[in-house]
Amino acid sequence: MQMAVINQTPVTRPQSGVLRLERILPGPLERVWVYLVEADKRAQWFSGGTTMSGVDQTATLHFQHSNITDEPTPERWKEMDDGGFKSEVTVLRFEPPKLLAYTWPESKGMSEVTFELSPVGGDTKLVLTHRRIGSTANEVSFASGWQSHVDALIQVLNGDKPTGFWANVLKLERDYKATF
């Protein structure tokens, strides 16, 4: 599948409680890997917090979306600006530079996020899978969030500041509510 096509494909829901997103990211595995695990680089597209370094590590994800975009934050996510929001995850798998998995706290217990990286020419294929999601409402939220954050990662890897982040989140949320 060509980069332009795969990067337009929406998040899929192979079964209830499971989301999957595939993207071709610009740059080699090693470069993409550091944007997943190093806190300062991850903060540019997703969340800062703790640099991830191995299995069984408890890591803090510090969400502060004002680090990602200059757009005004929608009201219901304002907490992400005012000091941010912190979430603790446990690293389940750590296989540099190809595989990272960690727990994800949600309202009905822990879900699990896996990032799989593989080389595609000089670029990197990302397969992001989020499992054990407790509700359709959370699936909608995670699908729109993951797609928007990975779109921001692509912009960062291209040397750009992410644009259109919140507009993307809101549009995708409407789309996934209708789909899921």
Segments predicted by a language model, with ranges:
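Beta-strand/loop substructures that line and gate deep hydrophobic ligand-binding cavities in soluble
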Residues: P14, V18, A101-Q147, L153-Q155
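Hydrophobic ligand-binding cavity/cleft-lining segments
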Residues: M1-V55
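Charge-dense, helix-prone N-terminal extensions
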Residues: A4-Q8, K86, G121
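A conserved amphipathic terminal alpha-helix motif
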Residues: A4, R131-F180
